[in-house]
């Protein structure tokens, strides 16, 4: 599995993920890029679950973003509908975390589109550890979103055997295009 974390603070949204790909109890790859930019660099997305499944979902989600002129919520709802009703897509096992400068969402294969409390997303096997860390940092520090994401992923990587510390971080600052952190 993996860990993906997204935090929104002070007009910025950051998302990061680890790089571990596991097959059963074996680490197959340590430097996978599970967080990427979509739709003209205006959206960041991360996945937890099967790698091949996630790439299929990224393609479908980006097509929905194009179809709906970058409207994140509309694209997420349409992807969730397709995911739930399409026989081939229903077999895909992954979760998507997506964010733009206005919204942060989790998209599931059950047809759910969830806007989390406090714009904090943490998915994957290390998600609960990263969520607890990010929440504590949000409530008790003035750290920037990208720093909270990084520290949360490091903590999750220390605890979860399916999460490493080879991190990919992306950030969107207001209406600017995302930058690699």
From Swiss-Prot:
PROSITE patterns: PROTEASOME_BETA_2 (PS51476). It is an enzyme of class 3 (hydrolase). Its EC number is 3.4.25.2. GO terms for cellular component: HslUV protease complex; proteasome core complex. Pfam families: Proteasome (PF00227). PANTHER family: ATP-DEPENDENT PROTEASE SUBUNIT HSLV, METALLOPROTEASE TLDD. Belongs to the peptidase T1B family. HslV subfamily. This is ATP-dependent protease subunit HslV. The gene is hslV.
